[in-house]
């Protein structure tokens, strides 16, 4: 059974606290937009599709609570203003992820249209928002499964010529923990496994935040898929290994520019360079909401820089053998006083990408080496 990282029912929202994984599987309840903002900023939830869904549902939960306690303004315009302000606040929690800003824009349109409707009230505007947010949750899962199927079929056709099983390397976490369910790049691996076409999956540790070792490895073990964890610095040796026989690298995306340049977790660019040298297919898996046609190229993408402590220390459980309680501790791993550069993302040039997998299919470059992503819309 695929992991369920986001649980939502009629205003009740709970998410797996990813800061506790893989040591403790604990759900955290989100009641309002402020708690949603902190869950995203503190990386209790991460992954571009997931944070968009959690942000929308956090505000939906807040509106449910206001209506339940009769604290919602009866005026449609007041509720519209309230929702727009909260959405813009939520977007500030992770500016790099286009899914979040895209979802916010769409939801602003929903409440604007609802507020202009004849007889509109605060309740009708709030209800329209809640319905739209809940529909986003359902659609994201459906889109992820389509992405998985399209990606699996492409790999089998283009990397294996229709014969044998695929061995795939992935980076960071792009599964149920990064989306509303199933996953994007990890969804491709799941689809290969469902078709009995997965030979083996490799996942990178993904320093410095270890999303690969903490989260992707957790999902692969949870789903009982044949998988192996490597450190980031082992990727070149893995691709060079005939024994490993990696057929494709599949990664997710936080933002895809109009020309195909892709911002994703730091280390993605390096994997793309290695893939090109070793003649291994390099694919980006992302829903259409991740594609930003207003961003013409990767040099326009704002890259978030994070705390130095993420590089100079590591967090994990104290080894209390035989104890059911897990005590998480932070251990320093670097010389004190050293300067640190910690960009959360890098940009992979479109020239290094063989295909971009969306819910509509796999977009490839034309004979001139150009993506035409506008054709997907």
Swiss-Prot record:
What Pfam families would the database entry show?
A: IF-2B
**What pathway annotation does it carry?**
Amino-acid biosynthesis; L-methionine biosynthesis via salvage pathway; L-methionine from S-methyl-5-thio-alpha-D-ribose 1-phosphate: step 1/6
Mainly localized where?
cytoplasm
**Superkingdom:** Eukaryota
Q: What residues make up the catalytic site?
A: 254 (proton donor)
Q: What are its E.C. numbers?
A: 5.3.1.23
Name a single GO biological process. Answer: L-methionine salvage from methylthioadenosine
List GO terms (cellular component aspect).
Answer: cytoplasm; nucleus
Keywords for this protein: Amino-acid biosynthesis, Cytoplasm, Isomerase, Methionine biosynthesis, Nucleus
Instruction: Tell me the GO molecular function terms.
Output: S-methyl-5-thioribose-1-phosphate isomerase activity
As for subcellular location, the record says: Cytoplasm; Nucleus
Give me the reactions it catalyses: 5-(methylsulfanyl)-alpha-D-ribose 1-phosphate = 5-(methylsulfanyl)-D-ribulose 1-phosphate
**Which HAMAP family did the record assign?**
Salvage_MtnA
What does the protein in this record do? Catalyzes the interconversion of methylthioribose-1-phosphate (MTR-1-P) into methylthioribulose-1-phosphate (MTRu-1-P).
Q: Which NCBIfam families match?
A: eIF-2B_rel, PRK05720.1, salvage_mtnA
Q: Which family does it belong to?
A: Belongs to the eIF-2B alpha/beta/delta subunits family. MtnA subfamily.
- Its protein name is Methylthioribose-1-phosphate isomerase
> What is the species of this protein?
Aspergillus terreus (strain NIH 2624 / FGSC A1156)
Q: What is the lineage of its organism?
A: Eukaryota, Fungi, Dikarya, Ascomycota, Pezizomycotina
Coding gene? mri1
């Amino acid at each position: 059974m695929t992991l369920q990282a986001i649980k939502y029912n009629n205003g009740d929202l709970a998410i797996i606290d990813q800061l506790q994984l893989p040591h403790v599987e604990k759900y955290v309840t989100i009641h309002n937009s402020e708690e949603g903002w902190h869950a995203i900023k503190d990386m209790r939830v991460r992954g571009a599709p997931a944070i968009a869904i959690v942000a929308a549902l956090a505000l939906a939960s807040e509106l449910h609570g206001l209506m339940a306690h009769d604290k919602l303004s009866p005026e449609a315009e007041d509720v519209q203003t309230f929702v727009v302000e909260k959405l813009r606040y939520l977007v500030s929690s992770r500016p790099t992820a286009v899914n979040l800003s895209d979802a916010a824009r769409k939801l602003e349109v929903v409440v604007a249209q609802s507020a202009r409707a004849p007889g509109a009230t605060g309740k009708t505007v709030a209800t329209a928002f809640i319905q739209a947010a809940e529909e986003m949750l359902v659609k994201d899962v459906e889109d992820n499964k389509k992405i998985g199927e399209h990606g699996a079929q492409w790999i089998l056709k283009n990397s294996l010529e229709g014969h044998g099983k695929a061995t795939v390397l992935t980076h960071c976490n792009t599964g149920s923990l990064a989306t509303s369910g199933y996953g994007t790049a990890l969804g491709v691996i799941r689809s290969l496994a469902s078709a009995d076409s997965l030979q083996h999956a490799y996942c990178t540790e993904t320093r410095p935040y270890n999303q690969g070792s903490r989260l992707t490895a957790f999902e692969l073990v949870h789903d009982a898929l044949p998988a192996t964890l490597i450190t980031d610095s082992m990727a070149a040796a893995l691709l060079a290994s005939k024994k490993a026989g990696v057929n494709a690298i599949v990664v997710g995306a936080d933002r895809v520019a109009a020309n195909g340049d892709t911002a994703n977790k730091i280390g993605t660019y390096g994997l793309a360079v290695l893939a090109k040298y070793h003649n291994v297919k390099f694919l980006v898996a992302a829903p259409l909401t991740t594609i930003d046609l207003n961003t013409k190229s990767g040099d326009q993408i704002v890259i978030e820089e994070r705390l130095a402590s993420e590089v100079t220390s590591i967090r994990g459980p104290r080894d209390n053998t035989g104890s059911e309680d897990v005590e998480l501790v932070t251990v320093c791993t670097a010389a004190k006083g050293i300067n640190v550069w910690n960009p959360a993302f890098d940009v992979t040039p479109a020239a290094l990408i063989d295909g971009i997998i969306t819910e509509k299919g796999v977009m490839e470059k034309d004979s001139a080496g150009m993506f035409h992503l506008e054709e997907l819309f």
